[in-house]
Amino acid sequence: MSSVTLTTTTTTTSTPPKPTPKDEPQEQIYTPWRLFIYDIWVLGIVSTLAWGCRISTYLIPLFRSNVGKKHLDIGAGTGYYLNQARIPSTTQLTIVDNETHALNVALARCKHPSTQTHGIVTDILQPSPFPETYLTNNDKKFDSVSMYYLLHCLPVPVASKCKIFTHLKKYMTEDGVVHGANVLGKGVRKDNWFARIIRRGCLNHGVFHNEEDNAYEFERALRENFWEVETWVVGSVFVFRAKRPILDA
């Protein structure tokens, strides 16, 4: 039988905010119909025509070929990548998001009769986003980590986004791999008319926070934290794979 669990982690930096009227419609946002539209529109049409990166050509193969026995996926979204990547049933899968409803959707979408699936609600920007046991118990460390179309949504400076790699490597095995992709805001090709409309809308509505995001700083952060680094820019998208974390002595 499948095993699906959900954990919520807390930090000492602040107390959880009280729900506001803006937060309440989240369950309505994550309806099957809207998620289907999201997959077709954002991950299909927009990624291909606006950002110049066809997910089925570039990202799904990368995801599929870099899933280990203990895999961590950060930024659950709709669970699209996990679903399309055909993850082996023997993989122990941990999915992370800062929003419970999105996480539940991804958990349900990726459920498999013989897969252990665990969900964690946490803030990946924190220096220690996971419980202490993930540091002290080697059996809990991840040999693969994915983060696709996540970084451009985080409302922090690019330097803070880069620190995620420093935080993450503590929870990875010595031969672990991290891979992902995000839409850049600087140093990429000039947006076509469709991309200009989409980018302006995403920035104005607070969906994107990537005006200063650039390939140079992301690659530098990866090389500071991993021994083996590969990066590509596909259209307006930064794609990366980094192996063997540089662990502190």
UniProtKB/Swiss-Prot annotation:
InterPro entries in the record: Methyltranfer_dom (IPR025714), MeTrfase_VrtF (IPR016584), SAM-dependent_MTases_sf (IPR029063)
Source organism (scientific name): Aspergillus niger (strain ATCC MYA-4892 / CBS 513.88 / FGSC A1513)
Leader sequence residues: none
Low complexity bias spans: 1-15
General function of this protein: O-methyltransferase; part of the gene cluster that mediates the biosynthesis of the linear tetracyclic TAN-1612 neuropeptide Y receptor antagonist. The decaketide backbone of TAN-1612 is synthesized by the non-reducing polyketide synthase adaA via condensation of one acetyl-CoA starter unit with 9 malonyl-CoA units. The FAD-dependent monooxygenase adaC then performs hydroxylation at C2 while the polaketide chain is still attached to the NRPKS adaA.
Pathway assignment: Secondary metabolite biosynthesis
Descriptive protein name: O-methyltransferase adaD
SUPFAM superfamilies for this protein: S-adenosyl-L-methionine-dependent methyltransferases
Disordered, as annotated region: 1-26
UniProt enzyme class: transferase
Keywords: Methyltransferase, Transferase
EC number: 2.1.1.-
Record-level Gene Ontology MF annotations: methyltransferase activity
GO biological process, one term: methylation
